[in-house]
Amino acid sequence: EKPLATWPEDLLVNLPRGISRHVVRFVHVGDEVYAMKEITRNVAEREYELLRRLQKLELPTVQPIAVVTGRHNAQGEPLEAILVTKHLKFSLPYRALFARNLRPDTAERLIDALAVLMVRLHLAGFYWGDVSLSNVLFLRDADAFSAFLVDAETGDLQVNLTEGQREYDVDLARTNIIGELMDLSSGAL
C-alpha cells in the first residue's frame, strides 16, 4: 500500500478540494465518488461514528462509508487510517465558489447557510469546535445555498450544549470566517 498522497493519478478524480490539515483525495468507484481522508485510526473511527450518528438524526452531513485500518507500506511500516465518505454530488467548497464569477452577495449567502447548519447542529446537541467555511460543502438551493458538514473530527454529540459551548462555536465561526474572507480578498485562493 501507499500513503494517500502518492496514489496514482489514474485512481483519482480531480474535484475541487477545500483546505485541509490532512491529505484528502477523491476516488471513483463504479458510479460513485468517495472522499478519502488520511488520519490517525482513533480520529478516523471517532469522526466516522459522529458522522453516522448525525446522519441518523437527519442532519446535513456527508455520508460516512468506512474506516480503512491496518494499512502498511511496502517496507511493512504502518500507514495512517483512511476515513471514507461519499462525495456529495454537485457540492463545492467555498473557495471553488469564489473562484467563479458570482453575485456580490455570495459571501452573505454562504455565511447564512453556515449559520443555519450551525443552529441545526447545536439544536441536536452537536458541539462543533472548529466552525469554518472550510469545514463544509455548499449546494446551490434555488437562490440560496445549503451547507453540509464534512469535517467533524473536533466535534462532540451531547444531550445538550452549554451556553459556553454555543458561544465558543459562534466566536470561533466569526474569527475563522473573517480570516477566510480576508484570504480570499487578498487573492489567496
Model-derived features: positions:
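Conserved ATP-binding subdomain of kinase catalytic cores across diverse folds
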Residues: 2-108, 112-129, 145, 176-178, ...
